[in-house]
Structure formats: C-alpha cells, structure tokens
C-alpha cells in the first residue's frame, strides 16, 4: 500500500507532500481507521521514563504539535515534536526540502520554521495523547548567538509542565552559528544555565523533566570527547546522536549535491553510527543515548542499540518506508 502512496507523494513538491501526508494521517485517525495496536512490545527505561518500546519519532516531522494524537497511534514508544522557538518564525525561503531517492536521502534547510512555543503548548493541551512526549527546543534566527541561552530558557520554562522530556537542539546546520554552541565554554555555559532552570522548575511543578541535548554527526573524536565531558559534568539526563550532516560527498555528482542544508536518511547512516560509538565509549554508561540517523530498516535500529543506544528515533526512513518501519524496527529489536 505505502509504495503506491509514495509514488504519488514523490510526484509532489516535497514540502507540500509533507503537509498532505500529515493532514491525511490526521483524517484517517479521526475516522478511527488506524488499527489500535499494543505498543508495549519491548519496555525500556530511558532518562527515568518508562517507554513501552524503544522506537521513537524524531523531531522535525510535527514541528508544532498539531498531529500528536495521529502520530501516537502508529506504535511509537515515544514522540518528539519541534523544533520550536520562543517566537513564531517562517524559516528559510522555499524551496527548502529536497528528496534524493537514488540515495534514500533528504536534504532540508527548513530553518526552524514553526508557530512558536505558545501555539505548540495550546496544541498539546488539546491533544489526548498520554504517552511519552518530548519537546525539541531551539533559538530564533534573529537572536544573536551570544544571547541564545535566553531563547532556550524561555522555551524550557514554557514547555516544562507539558513535556515528558525536553531536547536542546544545538546541532541544526540551518540556523546561523548554532553549531558553535556544541563546543567548549559555550556548551558548558548553556547547559549549566538550563540545568539550573530545570532544578527551579522541578521545585515549582513537583516533577522532574529530563533534559537531553542533540548533537551533529560532523564532529571529530576530540569534539565528541569534549561534549561527553561536558554533559557528564553538568549531569545532563541524555544525549541524542545525531542530527543531519552537512557533508554531501556521499551523493557524488548528483544534481542536488550542491544544495545547502542538512542531509538525512541513508547517507548519514555511517557518520551517525560512528559518532554514536565514539560517544558511547566516552560517556561510559553515565547517561543514556538516543540513536538517530539513517535508520531505513529494522537491522539499522538493532545496530544502534548494539553500538550503545538505549533507544532510537526514526524520521527519513518513514518517508521512504512508511509506518511499517516502526513494526520492522520493533521486530528486529525483539530478536
């Protein structure tokens, strides 16, 4: 069924197809046509949370929390929405989303297009979803990088009461200078500020919401070791490896190889797994890792668990394989 739907969707502009697919999924959900399935197939504990299974949805598919209920019916163990910023912003000019089917890849330079944290919170409040919900937070494009912490703190404070966990996105290649926050003093200062705010909010709300940080696949071992040291020293709750890559050499002479933006899907598979393994070695079990990047079949999810991830997330694989990828991953992890 999905291969036919994919042929139709791939005939459309990539961003239009994205919205059409989510709207169609929501309609099918509202009509009660998505079969109810038990997603408690492989329970696992992650950052103190009990997941029904370790296969999650990565941020980026539902930026504003508009489709939480429908996505929650697909069997995921957890869902991550966003990236969201304090204020609404349009993102980068279109076209900004490109499929590379010959390589099972996707290039995006969306630029954190979203309706803002206040709108997202209203959408969450209208949702009936009772599962594990992550909120991925970022900074507005107009905010100077030296003031980035202010944006993250605003989002953290507003999202805290509504999230199961919160992800600090400092690794998108589509917001100017954002990746500079991944290193040295900048990383320490940002994460320490967020951990201090987390402690205050835990006292206010009487609940502890874990904080994870999402990193890039384009890091060398020294940078990975530095990040591992910082996240352990500030006692982050988790780390997500990885975001999209800016390296498009795997596309060879493909016409889209020169497009700006982050590359995801199969082309990021090896780079993401390399970072995951090095990170796991340097983290030494001190905090859990969520593996994401290039999961196109069940065996890819199993590989990430074997390399040190506690849980995994999918996104681009869904575009190429459809919702059946979730069950395929769960089946592979059950072996």
UniProtKB/Swiss-Prot annotation:
The active site is at residue 172. It is found in: Cell membrane. Its EC number is 1.3.5.2. One of its GO terms (cellular component) is cytoplasm. One of its GO terms (biological process) is 'de novo' pyrimidine nucleobase biosynthetic process. Its cofactor is FMN. The keyword Cell membrane applies. Keywords: Cell membrane, Flavoprotein, FMN, Membrane, Oxidoreductase, Pyrimidine biosynthesis. Its main location: membrane. It is a peripheral membrane protein. Transmembrane segments: none annotated. GO terms for molecular function: dihydroorotate dehydrogenase (quinone) activity. It holds the Pfam family DHO_dh. The keyword Oxidoreductase applies. Catalyzes the conversion of dihydroorotate to orotate with quinone as electron acceptor. Belongs to the dihydroorotate dehydrogenase family. Type 2 subfamily. Monomer. This is Dihydroorotate dehydrogenase (quinone). The gene is pyrD.
